[in-house]
UniProtKB/Swiss-Prot annotation:
GO terms for cellular component: centriole; cytoplasm. Its main location: cytoplasm. It comes from Mus musculus. This is Protein SFI1 homolog. CETN2-binding regions contains a conserved Trp residue in their C-terminal ends, which seems critical for interaction with CETN2. It comes from the Eukaryota. Keywords: Cytoplasm, Cytoskeleton, Repeat.
Length: 1216
């Protein structure tokens, strides 16, 4: 195990899949295999050709492997803890697989359950169909068997009858042959005796032949007559069926024609209503347009007159003012007294007029009501005449009332018209201007509010409305699906009910058809039996008369009977085949006839209600004609009323215009006549007249507005009264028409039902009587002649009735089972639906719980990762300081000469070429060491590492820590280890720490990271390295206990050299460590910690030495302090640049993660994540602003950092 682990080394410092120490021997990844192959190549260069050094090299290699293995285990444990990423990944994959498998198992169980239910329903339906088919096939087989048995019995009986007939005919033939032989012998003997007897016998034989032919001809004529009668009966039956078919067709045609007439009349009525509406709308639009045009014309005339008057008033302003003031003063005094009197008279007149108008309207309404009640019993013409009389009276009253109002207004307004017109024009103009300004301001404000509302709607209300619309659309879709399902179920139930009714009616119709056919067949059999009885009597009479003719007649009769039986058999077989074919056609074409069942049922109802519809159509036609005439007359009346109103309005306008022009003319003449007298008196009373004029105008405006309001109110009341009157009249007409139509339809329907019931009762009574008579006749004849056949028929009928009852019971049972199965299927479907709904709800709850658990788990992981990362950074810092101290102690002896040489060169350059320093005393090596490490090489290496990490510059591998160790030991294998170590990368942060890292930043983390970094590494290194204190300050007599060869102590009896650490940067190692660390996204204080600026001086070994060594010369001390201050400033600048750069990287990664999260959330939008998305957007904006600021700072710091790096390089070159 040790060999396998020891053979592995670091390649690039990255372990992609780190494992615990227990699982390392079992898992060999490609990375470790590649790492394992590298030391083999490097070890080939390690070995020397000398054989005496092989053992030492081998021991050193094993030691290095043990140290590397130990550091690897420590790094894995510190980085990942007790649980490695591979095991965590495996556990996470197992959990995901278990979750996916659980969901899949639930979905599989639901799908299996649904599949089983579907298969069970299909199997049940197939079993039901198979059972139904099997039952039908069984009944069909039973019917076929019974038919075969009947055919066999009939054939057996036929063969027996044929055999009997053949035997009888053979016996008759034998008897006839014997008689013929006997007659031949006798005839021959007689011929021998006498020729006369021969001729006599021949004559007699011919006479018998003639009689036989005559009898046969008579029988043939009778048979011909019977056949013709039968053919006539069949033709009559066909004609009867054809006539019934024609009647049905005529009934359907009449029904269709009535329906078409109805539809046509309804369309005409609707068209007429539409035309009336259009005409009414056109009339209203015409009235409005006429009003608008008239108003515009009057306004234009008034505007023109006002402009003309204004032009005149511009020339005669003073004259008009003085005359107007005097006239207004006088007019106001007279008008005030006159208005007081007129107000009382107007109030009395208005009260009287209102009382009279109310009385007239009340009397008109009462008379109209009485006339309407009386007109219901009279004809329509009298109603129209009464209506015209009422309207003429109303027009007369209206004209009288209007003429009186006009006369009263003329009397009131004549004295004050000339003063009101000018003021009215001015006030109207001011009012128009104010209204227009208000309208403009209101419109501007509305536009501003509308713009704000549109912006608010687009920003806030539009997404909410879209979301509500989307939810409403989903709810509407679900409701539509449920509605379609309900409609389908209702349609299926209706189809089943209609099919059941149709099937019952078809069965009844089939039974009726079968009864009619059986009656026809029985009538035919009765006729055949009658003819047979008559013929049998005649044949018996002939047999009594002549036996020879009886034999021929019996033979012919038997032939006729055989033919009749064959015909009857063929007819019965044809009927049976036709019946079976119809049954099969009805059975196989039931699916096609199902869609036509409803139409057939409607046709049957239409045939029954044919007479009622005819009467209804006639009544409706007459009522439509009456309504049309009434509406035409009412429209003519309305047109006349409108024309009268238009004429009245035109006359009113013309009269007002004439009055206005007359008043203006009179006012002009009066003003021109009184100009001279008004000039003197108007100047003293200007102020008084103005005040009085304003008050008078205010009161006049109020009075005129009240009068206009009363006029408008009266006109509106009159219009409403007219509308109410017309509406009540139409409502009464419509109610009376509807009541009459309903009563007539109810009477017709009752009469039709009564007639149909009476016909049905008569038909049933006649059918019952015919059945009783027919059964009596059948009983009598069957009891007399065919008792055996009657018994067989009774038995067969009883069996058939029982079979039919059993078949009906079976059908009912099958229908009941089918109905129960359908109900069970629907209940099962409802249960499955509820179970599926519960499953979906439980699944959503489970998903929500899992999401909450995942969020809590992610937060917990983030906290744990942050704490572990802080601990790791503190441990790595302590470990690196310890390792640096150990390597410096081990390399002190090997690099002591180089340090001395560098110090002497530095002294020469600092003191100048003229100054000479004292030669150093010879150093003797002893157990005591003055300073323990070559700080020049260590700090130079660290500075080189820092510059290498900041500017990606290549440095020789001997400047690293392991390189100095290898140089001290004299082993070249350490060079490769140092190169691998220097090129190693730090461990990556897990992926779960990258999510939403910027949202959890707080100042507490910064303080926590600084506190953990500022802790002494002694407390954390005791657990890692077994309590060995590696971070103690380097005192002169104390050395840390580290593995490795001990160096011999050196004594310095003379002047001690100044340490190189005094001129090197104190925190170069820290800078190198910071630069060597990878940039991890997240906040800088705990994601990527940096060394604090105020470090403890005991932590740096160089500072501890420099504090002990005091400078000899003052110039050297001043030079050292200036150089140290410069290097500290360079260090601070580089450190600040590095921190800003790492902060920029972390902010950029945080912004990228936030953008990715936003893209993912926008791909699957949810209503709960809207607030969270807004927070993330604001956070993203803050991070982007921070990125921009950091980028600007980096741009500003690039030039000073470049100068600092150039300065450090120059110092290194100078020291080397």
């Amino acid at each position: 195990m040790e060999k396998k682990i020891g053979s592995r080394s670091f390649r690039d410092g990255v372990v992609k899949k780190p494992c615990s120490p227990k699982t390392l021997p079992l898992k060999k990844s490609s990375a470790f295999s590649g790492i394992q192959r590298e030391p083999s190549r490097s070890c080939h260069s390690i070995y020397y050709h000398a054989s005496q050094n092989w053992t030492r090299y081998r021991l050193q290699e094993l030691r290095i492997r043990c140290v590397a293995r130990k550091f690897l285990y420590l790094w894995i444990r510190v980085t990942f803890g007790r649980v490695t990423p591979s095991r965590a990944r495996i556990f996470h994959e197992q959990k995901i697989l278990q979750k996916v498998f659980g969901e899949w198992r639930e979905e599989w169980w639901v799908s299996q359950r649904e599949w089983k239910l579907c298969v069970r329903a299909d199997c049940h339906y197939r079993y039901y169909l198979y059972n139904l088919i099997f039952q039908n096939w069984k009944t069909f087989v039973h019917q076929q068997r019974e038919m075969r048995k009947r055919f066999r019995i009939a054939e057996h009986h036929d063969t027996k009858q044929k055999m009997c007939q053949a035997w009888k005919s053979w016996l008759i033939y034998m008897v006839s042959r014997r008689t013929k032989l006997h007659m031949k012998t006798t005839a021959l003997e007689f011929r021998r005796q006498s020729v006369l007897c021969f001729w006599w016998s021949k004559w007699r034989w011919r006479l018998g032949q003639a009689h036989a032919e005559h009898a046969l001809h008579a029988v043939a004529v009778k048979h011909r007559a019977l056949s013709l009668q039968l053919q006539g009966w069949l033709r009559w039956q066909e004609q009867l069926l054809i006539s019934q078919r024609d009647r049905r067709k005529e009934a359907t045609a009449v029904q269709h024609y009535q329906h078409w007439q109805k539809q046509r009349s309804l369309k005409a009525w609707l068209k007429y209503l539409q035309i009336c509406r259009v005409k009414r709308w056109q009339n209203e639009m015409a009235v409005q347009f006429h009003r608008a045009t008239v108003l515009q014309i009057h306004f234009c005339d008034w505007q023109w007159a006002w402009e003309w008057r204004q032009s005149l008033s511009a020339h005669q302003a003073l004259v008009v003012k003085l005359a107007g003031r005097m006239v207004l003063r006088r007019a106001f005094t007279h008008w005030k007294h006159y208005m007081l009197l007129q107000a009382e008279e107007a109030a009395q007149r208005e009260a009287a007029a209102e009382h009279r108008q109310h009385y007239l309207l009340y009397s008109c309404f009462r008379a109209f009501k009485d006339n309407v009640t009386q007109a219901r019993l009279q004809q329509t013409r009298k109603k129209l005449a009464q209506q015209l009389r009422d309207t003429t009276l109303l027009h007369r009253f209206w004209n009288l009332w209007q003429s009186r109002i006009e006369q009263r207004e003329e009397r009131v307004q004549t004295p004050s018209l000339h003063a009101a017109l000018s003021h009215y024009r001015v006030t109207v103009l001011h009012k128009c201007v104010r209204v227009w300004l208000r309208y403009v301001h209101k419109r501007q404000w509305q536009q501003l509010l509308r713009a704000r509302a549109d912006g608010h709607f687009q920003q806030r209300a539009l997404p909410a409305a879209f979301y509500t619309w989307y939810r409403g659309w989903l709810w509407h879709q679900q409701r539509r699906i449920l509605h379609t399902k309900a409609v389908r179920f209702h349609r299926g139930t209706l189809e089943k009910q209609v099919f059941a009714l149709w099937r019952q009616k078809m069965s009844q119709h089939r039974e009726n058809c079968l009864a009619e056919r059986m009656a026809i067949l029985q009538a035919e059999q009765q006729l055949l039996r009658r003819f047979w009885f008559v013929w049998h009597q005649q044949a018996a009479v002939c047999q009594l008369e002549r036996q020879q003719q009886a034999m021929a007649i019996a033979h012919h009769h038997s032939g006729l009977l055989r033919r009749a039986f064959c015909i009857w058999k063929e007819s019965t077989q044809g009927f049976r085949i036709e019946r079976m074919g119809r049954a099969q056609a009805a059975h196989f074409h039931s699916a096609q006839l199902l869609s036509r069942a409803w139409s057939m049922w409607r046709e049957c109802l239409a045939l029954r209600l044919e007479e009622q519809q005819k009467l209804k159509c006639a009544a409706l036609h007459s009522q439509c004609i009456l309504l049309r005439r009434a509406l035409q007359k009412w429209l003519v009346y309305q047109n006349r009323v409108r024309s009268v109103l238009r004429e009245v309005a035109a006359r009113e306008r013309q009269h007002n215009r004439q009055l206005l022009w007359w008043a203006l003319h009179l006012w002009r003449e009066n003003t021109m006549a009184r100009l001279d007298g008004a000039k003197k008196t108007s100047q003293a009373r200007v102020h008084y007249s103005r005040t009085l004029c304003s008050k008078v105008l205010v009161q006049w405006r109020e009075v005129t507005s009240v009068q206009i309001y009363y006029r408008q109110k009266e006109a509106a009341a009159l219009r409403e009264a007219r509308k109410a009157l017309d509406r009540g009249r139409l409502q009464n007409w419509f109610q009376h028409w509807r009541f009459c139509s309903q009563r007539a339809a109810q009477q017709r329907f009752q009469l039709g039902q009564a007639a149909q019931h009476h016909h049905w009762q008569l038909l049933m009574e006649a059918m019952a009587r015919w059945k009783a008579h027919h059964l009596g006749c059948i009983r009598k004849k069957f009891l007399q002649r065919q008792a055996a056949q009657l018994l067989a028929q009774r038995l067969s009928r009883a069996c058939f009735c029982q079979w039919r009852k059993q078949l009906a019971v079976r059908k009912q049972e099958q229908w009941g089972t089918a109905r129960a199965l359908w109900l069970w299927a629907f209940s099962l479907q409802a249960k499955v639906w509820t179970a599926w709904l519960g499953f979906v709800l439980e699944r959503r709850r489970k998903k929500a719980r899992l999401e909450r658990a995942m969020q809590a788990y992610q937060q917990q992981l983030l906290q744990e990762g942050a704490t572990r990362l802080l601990r790791f950074t503190a441990g790595t810092k302590a470990f690196r300081q310890q390792l640096q101290a150990q390597q410096q102690v081990q390399a002190a002896h090997s690099l002591h000469c180089a340090v001395r040489h560098c110090a002497e060169l530095w002294k020469k350059k600092v003191l100048g070429p003229g100054k000479t320093s004292q030669p150093p005393a010879p150093t003797t090596f002893s157990k005591r060491v003055t300073f323990k490490d070559s700080f020049l090489s260590g700090h130079a290496a660290e500075a080189g590492d820092a510059t290498q990490e900041t500017k990606k510059l290549r440095a020789p591998p001997s400047q690293g820590v392991l390189g100095s160790l290898a140089g001290a030991a004299g082993e070249p294998c350490h060079l490769d280890l140092n190169a691998a170590r220097s090129s190693r990368k730090q461990p990556r942060r897990p992926s779960f720490l990258l999510e939403r890292l910027g949202s959890q930043r707080s100042p507490e983390w910064y303080s926590l990271g600084e506190q953990q970094l500022e802790k002494p590494p002694e407390e954390e290194s005791t657990a890692l390295l077994g309590g060995s204190s590696l971070t103690r300050p380097f005192l002169p007599g104390v050395l840390p206990n580290v593995p490795g060869p001990k160096l011999p102590p050196t004594a310095s009896p003379g002047l001690e050299l100044l340490p190189p650490s005094s001129i090197m940067p104190h925190a170069a190692g820290g800078t190198a460590r910071v630069s060597a660390k990878p940039s991890i996204p997240g906040p800088q204080p705990w994601g990527c910690p940096s060394l604090p600026r105020d470090l403890d001086p005991q932590l740096l070994p160089g500072d501890s030495i420099s504090t002990r060594t005091e400078p000899v010369y003052g110039s050297e001390a001043t030079g050292h302090t200036e150089l140290e201050a410069e290097l500290e400033g360079i260090q601070q600048q580089l450190q600040h640049y590095q921190t800003t750069k790492q902060n920029l990287w972390s902010c950029q990664r945080q912004a990228n993660s936030l953008r990715r999260w936003l893209e993912l959330s926008q791909e699957e939008p949810k209503s709960e994540d809207l607030h969270l998305e807004e927070q993330v957007k604001t956070e993203l904006e803050e991070v982007e602003l921070q990125v921009q600021q950091l980028a600007k700072e980096l741009e500003a710091q690039r030039q000073p950092v470049g100068t600092c790096i150039a300065r450090v390089r120059a110092l290194r070159r100078a020291l080397c």
